[in-house]
């Protein structure tokens, strides 16, 4: 409790929340979708881009303005004691009849908004992939720590039994030292596994904004693999749906449209103008003449404004050339995106197949390692195998179990990588993986592998009562037989 209180205080100050119950993959993603700042930022950029279309369209619509003026004039010298006031109001209307630059600007913004929409879709898929990867990395770290803890317990039992057998003269001190060495090695591995789990949990928190005391773990019994579609079918689908490729195509279209927009600098413009106005003049003062009579005047005007650029110092031609170079660059980027999409699809396809093969291989490796360990333990009990053989077999078994677990998680992540490469990754894919999950499991290292102070103390004190204890008879004979290095 003393360790938990500072954590809770830190979370409350940091603005992070802690889930009150175990969450599965789909629930974790749904929480991330609502709070992930990267996705929300991309959504805001997309909305701003679409809103800017309205701004780009506005110059093509009628422009209506209302003006009003008030002027007071006070004379001096010859016009002394003469003053006047003028009040006027006007209403102006301007309508573009032909201005290709404004139409091109609207088209450019529409294409820009389309690119931003694809960027948002990419952010959605990235969040799905990042959430699933972080989630499975936590489960993988839990499994690694669990197997490391199980390996530690197994080696501890060997160390304890070997120490007892040495104390009664059944084994040599080297057996105890070998067991102790393996135990110390697995303790170092446990420290690393605990740290990896803490970091994995923190990475998931960074994606979702939440800490999860427990998560739904992988249901190994229900887990199964499926081979992907033929790679040619995947490549064909990626050609039309890969988001990076789609964004590059839209960028090329945008660059092509920019050339057309630059060329409008040579084109004429034609605007319609219309206005109506009213003016009220009032005169006063002791010396106001008879000619300065009060009057109210009004006027209506309609006109056309035509403009044809003849020469602008070469600026328009330069802008066209710049746009053409930008189009070449966008075309090369499209080719690069195309190659990258092919490479990503093929790599993801290969990774899925490799994961499936690895799962099958490690399943058999676990079975073989377990059989080997059983045989080594039986051989050690009758003296045909050494403690080193038993310890090596134990390490091999738990390494195979860890590799099998890692292969399962890699398979699921690689499945999502294929979907992402195709541009079809969505929430339904997470639901499919979510069906592979089962019981809840704690994410704290102290829950996965509780520290046992008594066991640690026993292991530290697991030293032979006498380092000079008599070597067992069988070992003495072996020593005497090998005392002469040249003897045969």
PLM features: what roles do these ranges have?
Residues 76-82, 217-219, 267, 282-290, ...:
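Outer-membrane beta-barrel translocator domains and adjoining extracellular loop/strand segments
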């Amino acid at each position: 409790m003393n360790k938990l209180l500072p954590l809770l205080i830190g979370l409350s100050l940091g603005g992070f929340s802690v889930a009150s119950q175990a969450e599965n993959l789909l629930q974790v993603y749904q929480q991330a979708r609502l709070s992930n700042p990267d996705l929300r930022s991309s959504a805001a950029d997309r909305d701003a881009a679409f809103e800017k279309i309205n701004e780009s369209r506005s110059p093509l619509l009628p422009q209506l303005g209302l003006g009003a003026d008030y002027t007071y004039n006070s004379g001096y010298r010859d016009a002394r004691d003469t003053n006047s006031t003028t009040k006027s109001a006007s209403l102006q209307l301007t309508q573009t009849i032909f201005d290709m630059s404004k139409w091109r600007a609207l088209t450019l913004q529409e294409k820009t908004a389309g690119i931003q929409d694809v960027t948002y879709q990419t952010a959605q898929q990235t969040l799905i992939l990042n959430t699933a990867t972080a989630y499975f990395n936590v489960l993988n770290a839990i499994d690694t720590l669990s197997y490391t803890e199980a390996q530690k317990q197994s080696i501890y039992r060997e160390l304890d039994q070997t120490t007892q057998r040495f104390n009664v003269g059944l084994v040599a001190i080297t057996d105890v030292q070998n067991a102790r060495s393996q135990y110390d090695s697995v303790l170092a591995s446990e420290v690393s596994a605990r740290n990896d789990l803490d970091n994995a949990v923190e990475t998931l928190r960074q994606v979702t904004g939440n800490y999860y005391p427990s998560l739904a773990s992988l249901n190994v019994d229900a887990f199964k693999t499926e081979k992907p579609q033929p790679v040619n079918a995947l490549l064909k689908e990626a050609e039309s749906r890969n988001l990076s490729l789609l964004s590059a195509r839209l960028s090329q279209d945008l660059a092509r449209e920019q050339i057309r927009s630059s060329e409008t600098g040579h084109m004429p413009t034609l605007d319609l103008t219309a206005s109506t106005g009213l003016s009220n003049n009032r005169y006063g003062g002791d010396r106001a003449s008879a000619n300065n009579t009060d009057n109210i005047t009004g006027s209506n005007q309609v006109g056309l404004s035509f403009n044809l650029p003849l020469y602008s110092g070469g600026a328009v031609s330069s802008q066209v050339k710049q746009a053409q170079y930008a189009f070449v660059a966008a075309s090369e980027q499209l080719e690069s995106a195309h190659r990258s999409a092919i490479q990503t699809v093929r790599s993801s396809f290969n990774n899925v197949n490799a994961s499936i093969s690895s799962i099958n291989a490690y399943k058999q490796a676990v079975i073989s390692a377990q059989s080997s360990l059983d045989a080594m333990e039986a051989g050690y009990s009758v003296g045909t195998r050494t403690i080193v053989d038993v310890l090596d077999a134990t390490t091999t078994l738990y390494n195979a179990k860890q590799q099998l677990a890692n292969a399962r998680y890699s398979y699921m992540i690689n499945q999502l990588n294929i979907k992402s490469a195709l541009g079809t990754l969505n929430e339904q894919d997470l639901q499919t993986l979510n069906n592979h999950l089962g019981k809840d499991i704690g994410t704290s290292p102290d829950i996965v592998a509780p520290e046992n102070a008594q066991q640690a103390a026993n292991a530290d004190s697991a030293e032979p009562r006498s380092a000079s204890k008599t070597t067992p008879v069988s070992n003495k004979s072996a020593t005497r037989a090998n005392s002469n290095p040249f003897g045969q």
